[in-house]
Amino acid sequence: GLFVRSYSIVPVVRVLYFLFALTMILKTLITFRFCHETKQGKIRRAETRGISVFHMLGEYRQLIPGMLKNRGVLKAVAVSVILYVTNMVSTNFFGLYVTQRLGLSENFLALFPILNAAVMLIFMIGLQHRINATKFRIPLWIGLALYVVAALVLIFSPADRLGFVLLYVFIAAMAAALVNPRKDVLLQLNITSQERARLNALIMASTVALSSPFGYLAGWLSSMDRRLPFVFTLLLFVTAMFVIGRIQEPQVEER
């Protein structure tokens, strides 16, 4: 926000893109230098040596029916889609809501992601290891309940009151620290290690495809009332709580 006011948005965005490109190059170099192929990856490379890419793509036809028959995977995908949609709505419409309806200055928009990241970091470092001893579903329920509370705080926030928006960001960050790691674990516990890479690719593609129509729906709701997209996310969080309630407590094998 400070740089935009001083130099305008175009040069600032150019610098951001340059920094992003630089960090991705560094990440790629570090990955190739210090990371190694997994055991299953080595097995898969040996199995597919000499096989064409088109033949390997055709093998997905055998994976899709198996994925659709696995209720655990379908429930995990449902939770993943719901959280993907709610994150998409929050990312795209939060700025519009707090500036156009709540009347906050655009200069505050840069503050909220910093606060969100700081709260998540403190929560994960200070409290996450203590929560890991509890049952798997309970932290997920608590996180989703916090998301519901955060949505209610934002929906009923009075205009020109920064404190309510900061409270929303704080609660949502705690919820994300509880939900996001366990959402990913939930997917991994329901797929076999032999097909993990291909199933993860299918699940990611399915998540993006299934969530795409909801972006249009959220935009339509926002055009009627800036609060409606967040009412929609509230309903999705309640739905996710119901889905989690239908999932059997995962059993993690100790080694």
Where are these regions (language model features)?
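Transmembrane alpha-helices of Major Facilitator/SLC transporters
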Residues: 109-131
